[in-house]
């Protein structure tokens, strides 16, 4: 390309893994395009879609339809769609939406990069373009795909088999992020605790944590999307003894009933799950646990749901999210079980579970009032810093709001403080957020 660069905008839908894919894409094409934040009048509009569950698919389809309308009205030039939705329905969507100029999958960005007139550069494989502004954290995708076959999940046939990124490549990528001012890495994958089995023939997450912690500038490393079956205990050793590894674990459990776990193909039972949670709390004192549950899965009757409620009450997860079961075509569930739990019952169970969790989260937050914690400043808005401690993960957990104090900050420009650490005394708490004051 010569002369004025064409403008290109990307809209990213879905999870943090999609965001990482977008950032890798932009690194490859940034020399050939002018990357813009506004979709209006962009020469190229790219949509990175999600196709995981019903609500996400609907959101992505609506986004494509709206973008197609804008293209028809002359507001955008070329319209290209990639990601999980197009990967999942690559055979059907081009016929249904011919106004889209190109459909690309989620497993390999190279066809899309080439369609944009750029030859993929090997030296840019571990580079990413972080969006405009100052950032304190970044997601680091350590593997692609999944070898698990949970009965409800469509990810394996969307994203393919598990494929670990070599440690040296991740260290290179993380070092590049640190050079851009990133202080916290959030490790993500479909199953982070499976990391390394395919290329090193053993679980290597603990080794990766150690290598990442040796990077200058990286201060916090956080683990998301761990899996309970065959959980590698050396990861807990890293968490307990490596000061850069946050005492925080995201471990989606999905249920506690033996019957439901078996139908879900989770490869654990309730006793194993309870023992693992106890071991985590014993080996890593003060660890904060985040989990995810599914309500309304086939086989979940009143008895199984009450068992789940009792487990959540006793386990006292500091963070918990929950979803209503969504039947997905092509999964084992869809082919073998009827979705017999009514939508009303699913919603009632979801409401009941989240009401219980609200009280647990509030009690945890109240217990922190009066404590002094190290926090990372993510944003500055309307006279307040938006911060997190090692016990809050970005984008999914609550925040710690701290009023800017020019005397305590020695009159520093508040915007220059984004991405730095300060000590804060917690003074107030609600169910999900905290308020604190700066301390010396």
PLM region descriptions:
Residues 110, 148, 193, 258-259, ...:
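Glycine-centered loop/turn positions within well-structured domains
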Residues 170, 187, 223, 251, ...:
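Conserved, mostly hydrophobic/aromatic
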Residues 1-195, 234, 245, 249, ...:
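Proteins enriched for Cys/Gly/acidic motifs involved in redox and nucleic-acid/cofactor modification
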Residues 78-83, 88, 93, 179-303, ...:
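Conserved SAM/AdoMet-binding glycine-rich loop
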Residues 189, 225, 253-255, 291-295, ...:
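Active-site proximal loops enriched in glycine and acidic residues that flank catalytic Cys/His/Asp
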Residues 261-264, 332-336:
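Short acidic, glycine/proline-rich loop/turn micro-motifs
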Residues 336-440:
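Terminal RNA-binding accessory module
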């Amino acid at each position: 390309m010569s002369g004025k660069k064409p403008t290109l905008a990307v809209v990213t839908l879905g999870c943090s893994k999609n965001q990482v894919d977008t950032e890798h894409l932009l690194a490859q094409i940034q020399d050939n395009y002018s990357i813009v934040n506004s979709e209006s009048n962009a020469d190229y509009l790219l949509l990175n879609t999600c196709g995981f569950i019903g609500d996400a698919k609907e959101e992505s389809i609506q986004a494509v339809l709206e973008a197609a309308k804008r293209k028809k009205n002359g507001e955008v030039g070329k319209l290209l769609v990639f990601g999980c939705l197009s990967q999942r329905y690559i055979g059907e969507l081009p016929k249904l939406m011919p106004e889209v100029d190109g459909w690309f999958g989620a497993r390999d960005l190279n066809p899309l990069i080439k369609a944009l007139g750029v030859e993929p550069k090997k030296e840019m494989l571990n580079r990413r373009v972080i969006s405009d502004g100052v950032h304190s954290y970044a997601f680091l995708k350590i593997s692609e795909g999944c070898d698990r076959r949970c009965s409800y999940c469509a990810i394996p046939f969307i994203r393919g088999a598990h494929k670990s990124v070599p440690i040296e490549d991740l260290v290179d990528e993380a070092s590049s992020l640190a050079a851009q001012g990133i202080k916290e890495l959030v490790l993500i994958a479909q199953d982070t605790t499976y990391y390394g089995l395919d290329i090193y023939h053993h679980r290597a997450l603990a080794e990766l944590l150690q290598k990442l912690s040796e990077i200058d500038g990286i201060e916090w490393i956080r683990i998301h999307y761990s899996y309970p079956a065959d959980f590698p205990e050396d990861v807990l050793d890293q968490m307990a003894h490596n000061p850069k590894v946050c005492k925080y674990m995201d471990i989606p459990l999905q249920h506690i009933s033996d019957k439901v776990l078996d139908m879900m193909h989770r490869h654990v039972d309730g006793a194993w799950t309870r023992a693992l949670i106890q071991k985590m709390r014993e080996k890593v004192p003060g660890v904060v646990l985040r989990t995810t549950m599914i309500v309304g899965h086939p086989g979940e009757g009143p008895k199984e749901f009450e068992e789940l409620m009792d487990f959540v009450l006793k386990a006292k997860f500091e963070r918990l999210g929950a979803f209503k079961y969504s039947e997905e075509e092509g999964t084992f569930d869809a082919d073998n079980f009827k979705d017999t739990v009514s939508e009303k019952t699913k919603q009632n169970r979801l409401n009941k579970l989240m009401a219980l969790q609200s009280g647990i989260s509030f009690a945890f937050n109240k217990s922190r009032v009066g404590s002094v914690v190290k926090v990372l400043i993510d944003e500055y808005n309307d006279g307040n810093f938006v911060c997190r401690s090692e016990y809050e993960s970005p984008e999914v957990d609550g925040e710690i709001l701290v009023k800017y104090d020019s005397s305590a900050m020695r009159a520093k420009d508040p915007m220059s403080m984004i991405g730095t650490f300060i000590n804060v005394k917690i003074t107030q708490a609600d169910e999900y957020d905290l308020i604190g004051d700066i301390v010396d």
